[in-house]
């Protein structure tokens, strides 16, 4: 009859809404459904750090001039599934013309061994460009070893560092020995050193 028909249709509509809701959900730790993103974020001094287990983990650090809710997103190359990890922030005092900033740290875990990944930073709907990293495959590896780099002007050091990496793009990580800067309490010198390592320390860990 008419009443029975209405009940059946209402039940069918409810099931349809339930299934639609399930289809729109995301796994824990993954980024939310696609929203318009602005690739205008410019984090400062992005770097990768050697982890206790380079086959499955990677630590990402970067700086911003303000305190915000920050995330690092990453995905395996060739895979559209994006994972999101919160980044912990802490105040970093500046000096010598460098303003105070916030340094953020995010640990990426349970990565695939010997796999190519890309990562980016995110605040709200603003993201940085994608940057690359690769996990250790457990086999033989190459490293770039840099000597004492402290100096008053890092122009020459920047050229040396870039050339060494250009000739060893297959390096798994880099090591900087000796004094990295002339005054370890001077944030200005640290920023100068890290600018000279851009394109290196954001691609391989050190």
Question: How should these model regions be labeled?
Answer:
Residues 1-2:
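Short, Lys/Arg-enriched N-terminal segments with co-localized hydrophobic residues
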Residues 138-206:
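Active-site neighborhood of divalent metal-dependent phosphoester/pyrophosphate hydrolases
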Residues 7-25:
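Sec-dependent N-terminal signal peptides of Gram-positive bacterial secreted proteins and lipoproteins
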């Amino acid at each position: 009859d008419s009443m029975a028909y209405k009940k059946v249709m209402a039940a069918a509509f409810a099931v349809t809404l339930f299934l639609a809701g399930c289809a729109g959900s995301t796994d824990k730790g993954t980024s939310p459904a696609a929203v318009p993103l602005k690739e205008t974020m410019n984090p400062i001094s992005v770097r990768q750090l050697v982890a206790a287990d380079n086959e499955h983990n990677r630590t990402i650090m970067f700086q911003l001039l303000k305190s915000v809710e920050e995330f690092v997103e990453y995905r395996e190359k060739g895979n559209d599934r994006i994972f999101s990890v919160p980044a912990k922030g802490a105040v970093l005092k500046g000096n010598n013309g460098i303003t105070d900033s916030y340094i953020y740290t995010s640990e990426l875990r349970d990565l695939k061994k010997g796999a190519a990944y890309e990562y980016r930073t995110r605040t709200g709907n603003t993201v940085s460009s994608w940057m690359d990293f690769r996990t250790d495959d457990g086999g033989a590896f190459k490293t770039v070893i840099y000597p004492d780099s402290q100096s008053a002007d890092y122009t020459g050091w920047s050229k040396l560092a870039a050339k060494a990496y250009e000739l060893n793009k297959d390096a798994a990580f880099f090591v900087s020995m000796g004094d990295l800067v002339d005054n370890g309490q001077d944030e200005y010198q640290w920023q100068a050193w890290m600018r000279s390592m851009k394109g290196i320390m954001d691609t391989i860990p050190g």
